UniProtKB/Swiss-Prot annotation:
InterPro entries: Ribosomal_eL40_dom (IPR001975), Ribosomal_eL40_sf (IPR038587), Ribosomal_zn-bd (IPR011332), Ubiquitin-like_dom (IPR000626), Ubiquitin-like_domsf (IPR029071), Ubiquitin_CS (IPR019954), Ubiquitin_dom (IPR019956), Ubiquitin_ubiquitin-like (IPR050158). Residues 1-76 form the Ubiquitin-like domain. CDD domains: Ubl_ubiquitin. This is Ubiquitin-ribosomal protein eL40y fusion protein. PANTHER family: UBIQUITIN. In the N-terminal section; belongs to the ubiquitin family. One of its GO terms (cellular component) is nucleus. There is a cross-link at residue 76 (Glycyl lysine isopeptide (Gly-Lys) (interchain with K-? in acceptor proteins)). SUPFAM superfamilies: Ubiquitin-like, Zn-binding ribosomal proteins. Keywords: Cytoplasm, Isopeptide bond, Nucleus, Ribonucleoprotein, Ribosomal protein.
Amino acid sequence: MQIFVKTLTGKTITLEVESSDTIDNVKAKIQDKEGIPPDQQRLIFAGKQLEDGRTLADYNIQKESTLHLVLRLRGGIIEPSLMMLARKYNQDKMICRKCYARLHPRAVNCRKKKCGHSNQLRPKKKIK
């Protein structure tokens, strides 16, 4: 039978499957067509996320049904060089003593009107 898989970009993929096929098999077919690894795929049908070990028949997926493909978001650790860059970007600032505006490291006067473009600046305190 034929089913459709719709991605978040609006692209529709057509797959040839059997009702006895597992969700794992469907994800493998999507990988063959689109190159998306199965561990990054989440399939949704009738508002439910489909579990890998179950079959299409378990979810009452019939011919010409449409599944929705969502990519799994993975959290993780930031690379050390990017961490240093982010820390440098966020900590190398000057602070206005009157209005507490964050300014670039070589600032001489504040850019805000509310403090009268004060020249009373201090370096931002470093995080321990």
